[in-house]
Design a protein with these regions (language model features):
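Acidic-enriched, low-complexity/disordered segments with a strong bias for Aspartate over Glutamate
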Residues: 5, 27-28, 53, 60-62, ...
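Generic secondary-structure transition motif, activating predominantly at the C-termini of alpha-helices
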Residues: 71, 75, 79, 89, ...
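N-terminal glycine-rich phosphate-binding loop and ensuing alpha1 helix
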Residues: 2-87
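Short, flexible, glycine/charge-rich loop motifs used to bind or transfer phosphoryl groups or to couple energy/partner
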Residues: 1-2, 132
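Conserved alpha/beta core of the MobA/IspD/sugar-nucleotide pyrophosphorylase nucleotidyltransferase superfamily
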Residues: 3-8, 188, 194-222
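Conserved beta-loop-beta/alpha segment of the NTase-like Rossmann-fold superfamily
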Residues: 85-203
């Protein structure tokens, strides 16, 4: 069996801290972006459309019960929606499991951000998979943001490229997630470990808006 058979793409949907810019008592990701889909569901559908084998939502611990109730524990692979030629379509559907992770208590108020949520979900997904089988260990991670500008149905048209790629990122007007745009991207296990080391070595424990410098007096510890 070749190594390609063991490729495992895990979707990650990071949520921010539980306060809301709209003064809601729940995460802003629950806001509808269409009549039937909210922002979190849109991000999950994008992961499913990209061909993820499982999806991990990283959120504040207090939000997990509401997420489980509203989001559920699985999503259908949309590529099977239009297979009307199947004799029994209901038997050929693929269900992608949805799991939930949360930041450790010591990280709350210090590292609970989109970036750390991605790292945390990546490590939790890897640890759980490794405890089951080495063949389930994810080799790549697909990150989708709830407030992304990406059309969540679009990735299914690029599955071949996604499956064969290592690192990959969406661009818009020449910008990517590296420009602080909420655009989806794929990173590897090596990137995950490197990002974790970088946070531990260079993290300050401070919150700072992207446009502010280190010497700005307006930024402070949470």
């Amino acid at each position: 069996m070749s190594s390609i058979d063991h490729r495992h793409l895990v979707g990650i949907v990071p949520l921010t801290k539980p306060y809301s810019i709209y003064n809601n008592t729940w995460d802003d990701g629950f806001i509808n972006i269409s009549e039937t889909v909210n922002a979190i569901q849109g991000a999950i559908l994008e992961c499913a459309s990209a061909g993820c084998d499982s999806i991990w939502v990283n959120a504040d611990y207090e939000q997990i019960p509401l997420l489980k109730k509203k989001i559920g524990s699985w999503v259908e692979d949309p590529i099977y929606y239009c297979r009307t030629f199947e004799k029994r379509p209901s038997l050929t559907k693929k269900y992608i499991p949805i799991f939930y992770s949360w930041n450790h208590q010591k990280d709350v108020g210090r590292r609970d951000s989109y970036g750390w949520g991605i790292i945390n979900a990546g490590f939790v997904a890897s640890k759980v998979a490794a405890n089951i089988s080495k063949h389930l260990l994810p080799d790549r991670f697909y990150v989708s943001f709830p407030f992304s500008v990406t059309n969540f149905w679009q990735p299914q048209h690029h599955r071949k490229k996604i499956n064969l790629s290592g690192r990959l990122c969406f661009t818009h007007n020449g910008k990517t997630f590296l420009d602080n745009e909420m655009l989806s991207f794929i990173f590897t296990q090596e990137d995950l470990r490197s990002a974790n080391r970088n946070v531990k070595e260079k993290g300050t424990g401070f919150y700072m808006p992207v446009t502010q410098g280190l010497n700005d007096p307006d930024w402070s510890k949470p």
